[in-house]
Amino acid sequence: MSRQAWLLVAISGLYVGATALSNTFVNAYLWKLERKFATLGWFNLAQSVAMGLAFVTAGYLTNRCDRVWALRLGMLAHVAFYLTVLQLERHAPAYALPLGLLLGVGMGFFWFGYNVILFDVTDPENRDRFNGTNGLVMSAMGIVAPLVGGWLIGRETFAGYHWVFGLSLCIFALATVLSGLLRPRADADGFHLRPVWRASWSQHTRWHAVMVAMLLEGLREGVFAFLVGVLVVVATGSEWRLGLYATLSSLVSLASYGVVGRFVKPHRRRQAALVGSLLATASVLPLLAEVSFATLVVLGVGTAIAYPLFIVPVTSTAFDVIGAAPHAVRDRTEYVVMRELALNVGRVLSVAGFLLLVAWRETLTLLAAYLALTSSALVGAALWMGRSEPEWKAKE
């Protein structure tokens, strides 16, 4: 991989380290203050909506300046989010919607910049290696950060949350400085979203299959992003246990990403994604019998093994389809925007369903059933991604 690719790995590693330190506990923080699942739902719904809007805005701006600025603006928005949470203290749940919007803007800008730069610094020959290596680094950061966060919060509770959010600010600042080493690449060809939008709806295109797969993946991600961690706190009453849970999951995920990056080659992507999606869905089933720390650990370990099997081939295939499209280099930002819009539509639908569920009844059994239902969408995502007919299919 090139030096720019390794630099992107370092920046995303710092970003994931900061989010693993704080985002792991943000939903637990809101839960502890108000103990309402609906508050968490509105916070995450606002976050998903803002992410989609941020991607479109970032795509428009990137064609008038450099895509590195999207990365930086995303990290600066994270800094603003945590500063605001620190200022609001125990009043944070009352501002769940604006806080969710601010965090969503940060995530949208960062991941837009990351995905466009990923396309620029990789190619079909090294994309699987990059995604595997990046997954290893992210998992390594995910091992240490939640453990530190859980330990700090476990010692001092709400004061510990302040320490955790403050540390994240420092890490985001370091990542922002490091982004100055990324090579600029401005685009002056304008923002051509309409042709990519049409391709997304045209059922005979490979891109349509990618879009459906992304929407289905978003259905799973929307509720999993916050509910599992909160269930650990509900089941144990301990942020320290949540930190242990996240660390154990990341440790297993580290090994899984290593294996996937080494052995899952283009001609094995379809099978790997399908196996990963089935295993991820099966990992949720013990929760239907009982929501306890033990069954949540089964879910965490199972997902840590399965998700790299799913996400590495799916991500690589999506970018290969973009790379094979007409005007791929010119329109890469538009393809990234549409990909993330599909993901966020899935997330919004998932969280909206969660809000309807908790408005009707709040029971752990129903929440576990909803996790199982949304997780099964990964199987559909794997099957649809297989229909995208990537370039390696012709070589088999």
Regions found by a protein language model. Name each.
Residues 1-53, 205-247:
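Helix-loop boundary and gating motifs at the non-cytosolic
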Residues 13, 92-110, 215, 294-311:
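Hydrophobic core of transmembrane alpha-helices in multi-pass small-molecule transporters
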Residues 28, 32, 144-165, 230-234, ...:
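Transmembrane alpha-helix termini and helix-breaking/packing motifs in multi-pass membrane transporters
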Residues 54-67, 153, 256-269:
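Helix-to-loop junctions at the C-terminal end of transmembrane segments
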Residues 76-91, 278-292:
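C-terminal ends and interior cores of transmembrane alpha-helices
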Residues 109-123, 228, 308-327:
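Intracellular juxtamembrane helix-capping segments at the cytosolic ends
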Residues 129-150, 339-351:
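Glycine-rich segments within core transmembrane alpha-helices of 12-TM secondary carriers
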Residues 162-181, 365-384:
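Symmetry-related core transmembrane helices of the 12-TM Major Facilitator Superfamily/SLC fold
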